[in-house]
Amino acid sequence: MKNHMSDMSPEEVRQLVRKGQMTGPTAGMAASYAQANLVVLQKDLAFDFLLFCQRNQKPCPVLDVTDAGSPVPAIAAPGADIRTDFPKYRIYRHGVLTEEVTDITPYWKDDDVGFLIGCSFSFEQALINQHIPIRHIDEGVNVPMYKTDIDCVPAGPFSGKMVVSMRPIPERLAVRAAQVTSRFPAVHGAPVRIGNPQSIGISDLHQPDFGDAVTVREGEVPVFWACGVTPQAVIMEAKPDIVITHSPGHMLITDIRNESLAVL
Amino acid sequence: MKNHMSDMSPEEVRQLVRKGQMTGPTAGMAASYAQANLVVLQKDLAFDFLLFCQRNQKPCPVLDVTDAGSPVPAIAAPGADIRTDFPKYRIYRHGVLTEEVTDITPYWKDDDVGFLIGCSFSFEQALINQHIPIRHIDEGVNVPMYKTDIDCVPAGPFSGKMVVSMRPIPERLAVRAAQVTSRFPAVHGAPVRIGNPQSIGISDLHQPDFGDAVTVREGEVPVFWACGVTPQAVIMEAKPDIVITHSPGHMLITDIRNESLAVL
């Protein structure tokens, strides 16, 4: 067994998860590879949700969509099974969390469609590679996330405001952070705003709507990126009969190298 | 009236088209703005086609998708009507071209979904801005297009090979051409291949499958980009009851500035 799960291959991590030997958060595992969020919807809602993602690519960057009834993400991880390879799942009925499980095989239906959504871990790695510090990692907490007053473009029953994540960046590095993350449109891409939280409807940085507050130091500017919590919030508002998501922080390790997601 | 249609606004061109006063090709009109290809499908095929586009973004870059039954592309051109604002349309029944018309209002159905697909005009403008010559423009012909042996990722009934367009580029500028077009993933983006046509199944550059052959000069390398003819070819193979497309070269002028499509 490898000393560090960060050195494992995606398949090695997925095997541990599939066997139930790893049920915790996936941050830092198989570090060069993209991790994916999950949304499972029934086929009748799949077109409108895919359309919502297409219209709101910054908060909803789609890495892969499974064929109806197939649990295999053929593009992102052909050897994976989305019913078993996330460490933890949440089941929502009519917008209410009813169960948290480690295997959704009993819930899987013939017309289910799985959406794998890109995650900020990929661009955080790119920032770290540039020696740009990530405060919530250094402080050992979840990234702070905020509801904004930015409207998503609606599609069918799906509509709502964009949720953003915030990372405090030294002012001299803010432009570099924008450049570096612009290379990765498949995982939220460039920031939506640098500084001035009020301008996007955030009144108090110390009171995030999701995740944990982090320290913003003298000489740092808060930088806001579109966040994958957006599609989840939008789906809950639409209150489908049933929707399955990953549990926060408990992602699928794909076979896609972070660096291969760069457009330049 | 403006001296040159290249200086007109998108809305001005669309008005002329809508009134039937302009029924020709749109190349060069409202030159700073993105032009869009069209595919209209009935709702029951829309999910699989959107999925096909999501899985094959280089040949099928989606700029906008209309809500079922709505002819208004709310993101790309909120003042436009896709039933009247393309100069010419083609109607295909079971994969066979049956009519060419200038107005599809009589054909429009309550559950029709319109897909606006990005077009190479946008990145050609970016190349021209870098003083990289575009041979088929200089020779006054259509861009040469070739079927390759590159498989698209299938989705539902949609599958087939990628079609590419070719532009001969001076060898010293080929890398620059790749860089410049990489900025525009929403309009086919980076080349799929530089040189060696045989490596993607093209046996004779002088015999394009679509469009016209162009001169490749000494010291030039053929550069291949994914082409918007791909989704059309794939749809014809699927032989839906009815599908409506724009006529080749007869595009919609959107309100999206080419330069705003750049990711960097």
Swiss-Prot record, chains A, B:
Q: Which EC number applies?
A: 4.2.1.-
Listed GO MF terms: lyase activity
The answer to whether the entry has keyword Acetylation is no
Which class of enzymes does this protein belong to? lyase
Q: Which Pfam families match?
A: D-Glu_cyclase (PF07286)
Q: Which SUPFAM superfamilies match?
A: PSTPO5379-like
Keywords for this protein: Lyase
Please state the span of the N-terminal signal peptide per the UniProt entry. none
Query: Which protein family is it in?
Result: Belongs to the D-glutamate cyclase family.
What's the name of the protein? Putative hydro-lyase RBAM_004300
Q: Which organism is it from?
A: Bacillus velezensis (strain DSM 23117 / BGSC 10A6 / LMG 26770 / FZB42) (Bacillus amyloliquefaciens subsp. plantarum)
